[in-house]
Amino acid sequence: CNRMSYVVEAAIGIDEKSATATRGWFRIDPAACRVVLQGALTADRILLNARALGVYGASPIPQSGNDTLCIAQENFVIAAARQCRTGQTPAPFTQITPTQTDDGNLVAYLAEDSEYDDEQARLAGIQRLLVIAGYDAAPIDGVDGPKTQGALNAFLKSRGLSADVVQSPNFFTTMIDAVQS
């Protein structure tokens, strides 16, 4: 689950017995969750690498970790992820320990130092993209106020979008497309 103010792409690494595999990219919007593994989890270790979308510039997400595993630029599944081949790049992965939810699923959260809850992460993500698009929605703090609403309304009006699009599940895709055009 993403509790950051960035739209991220995540890659997972699975260590099982003597084999390590990686898979990515899973796009996760702020305040959203993605299923990245299904079925019984038998892995010895689960590892994670995350990157912010290119629209943010240099990735603001620290690239650190104790394991170096192979990734690719586009979507990938790499079976032997400790020896990179052509088109694959070594990247740092961090071991994660998901927690069990009430419904029995395992969940792990990506978070910033600001420790946003889901609602704050979503709003901070919108503020961040508004600032990149040239609207004054600063500070990026996940707090709703007249300045954020004014910037959001100006953005929607300039793109000919109705206010209800903000609640749609594809709103971050809509914003990123607008920022990149």
Predicted regions and their residues:
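Cell-envelope/ECM-targeting effectors and their regulatory/trafficking segments
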Residues: 1-3, 11, 32-34, 45-47, ...
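Intrinsically disordered, low-complexity Pro/Gly/Ser/Thr-rich segments with frequent PxxP/GP/PP motifs
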Residues: 17-43
